[in-house]
Amino acid sequence: MKQTHRPPRSIYPAQNRHMRRRTRVLAGLVAVLCFGGLLARLFTLQILDPSGYANRAAAQQLRDTTLPAARGEIYSADGVTLATSKTCWTIRASPRELADELVQPAAKALSEILDIDYDATLQKLSKRTSNDCLLRRRVDADLADAVRAWCTQNNAQGIQILQDTKRVYPQGNFMGCLLGFTDVDNQGLWGLELQYDAQLTGRNGTILTAKNAWGYDMPTHYSTLQDAVPGNDITLTIRADIQHYLESALSAAVAEHHVAARAVGIVMEVDTGAILAMSTKPDYDPNDPRTIVDETIRQQVNALSGEERSKALQTAQQAQWRNKAISDLYEPGSVFKLITCAAALDTGAVTRNSRFVCAGKINVAGTNFRCANGHIHGSETLAQGLAVSCNPCFIQVGARLGKQNFCDYFAAFGLRAATGIDLPGEIKRSEYYTADRMGPVELASCSFGQSSKVSYLQMITAVCAVVNGGKLMQPHVVQSIRDTERNTVQQVEPTVKAQVIRPETSAVMRELMEGVVTTGTGKNGAVAGYRVGGKTGTSQKLDSENERARIASFVAVAPIENPKIAVLICLDEPHSWTTSGGALSGPVAAEVLQKGLPRLGIQPSYTEAEQAKYFTTVPDVTGWKAPAAAQKLSEYTLTADVLGQGERVVSQYPRAGTTVRRGSAIQLDTTGQLDPAADEG
């Protein structure tokens, strides 16, 4: 019989059955647990926390983007935009989102478009675990568009183009020390930008929107969470036209007279304390504040290296940014005689006709003081002594006034404390003698403007009090602040800080100051058509290592019969044919007055002598040959502007008999095409 083979039976049949049963039970339990977990998760998502699930889903599709708020604008009193905000873009990258094969091409393209270093860009993009890195800030629209185009063309994810704003100063190198500047985050760092940072800074907004990787909005719904609110706008008391006249004249003086330690100019409204112009030259362009403007200093800094160069650059930048008009002290020199004179008149210690003797020098308690340039004026009145700026005269005036009265009026004119102007960086102290420390020698020296140091702003503020009826005004540069709806947030009104001298004293001082310009040392400050009062100053810098260092200054007030504006010009260490304030600074002040007064609606009124000196009547040269007509005009101190190639003059403009300023150009038409009536209209 044939045998068949069967598989052997397990020798442990009961044990195998038990294991199979356990496996089935465990598998069932796992299935139940998984299904239960899934049910619990669905219950949580659908019933207990539906919004949390939606938020997490949206977070993968939506981007929370800051909408930068524009910084407030700054305007001049005559409506010129001085500081504004411009839209720009920031380019950032998320290297972990950028495809490996695009790292090097992206580094090459972005470094070329954005003008940034290739190696540094490649290093940033190669950090594959990085979520964010900055490539370049403050990119203009054309560069941002170029980056977008490259990203679109190469389907590059991880490059972000974010909207931002940057501060722009449309007038360039204009009012730098006054306006100041901001940092890359648009926070004020200097000048008005710092002083009014809280007002100028807006409130950023936020937008939740679907975006692709390089910053494009995707075609889907988005919701704005909060609109950006721009900062408040500020209107200054500064007039751009007056500021331009001041800066132009001051820069020319710095160049012509080789001023070594910068020059200062301030124009103040006499009755209100409003600053119409303020300048320190040389200064800087607030669009590029870290570039040294002074070529000599820039070359000196660039000649250094390493840490030495860094320190020198920082020192030069700080000096360039410094608003010398409010931050530095100086010896006012003979301009200060106005204060001594006003105090002595107000107390009755002297009158305008009090007489003094100048022998060229005077001895006080064993110390000799000489008159400027060794002049011997002999017997002179107070008016004459002020006109010729006689030192011995004012030493005697100071002695009659007395040290206590001198110190009291020094304080009353605001010369011991900061003015409190709405600008940062004003020096908080001045240098002066108190009555208990002042002997006869110190009183003598202080009486004519030496041995005390004040700020330039303090000095012109005090001079305004001398001529405006005796009121010490609060100087200020901001006129008003408005929000984006043009609602007035703040309106600055003139503030009288003190009544320093009697109005009668002020009236006498105006007459004496006019004499300085008409008959004395201030003749270079005269302006045709206006009555001008002033005072010259040439002060020694007592703390300078250079014994010949001087400050040439001049203060002018016009119209002196009804004062509207005061102008202070100071050239610190001029290297010219003279250091006289009347000779160097007087013409600068006169130029500012001549150009500025008409802009303020104050028209000239000429005397007969001025009319003859500055004006002439246009002769009739029609029918004349052109060369002969030009020669005839030159006899009247006029120039010819010949139009066309004709032989004879057919018509002229202005017409014959018109009164014009000498030096004017007269149009001579040889073609017959000139229509004078059109020009007159």
What are these regions (language model features)?
Residues M1-L304, L329, Q404-G414, G525-V527, ...:
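Periplasmic/cell-envelope proteins involved in peptidoglycan metabolism and beta-lactam response
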Residues T4-R6, A83, N212-L225, D271-V335, ...:
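Beta-lactam-recognizing serine transpeptidase/beta-lactamase-like catalytic domain environment
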Residues L638-V642:
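A non-catalytic structural micro-motif
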Residues A156, A260-A263, T351-N353, A418, ...:
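Short secondary-structure junction motifs
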Residues C133-C151, Q160-C177, D233, L415-T419, ...:
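Conserved SxxK-family serine transpeptidase/carboxypeptidase catalytic domain
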Residues V660-E680:
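Conserved "repeat-terminator" motif of extracellular CCP/Sushi domains
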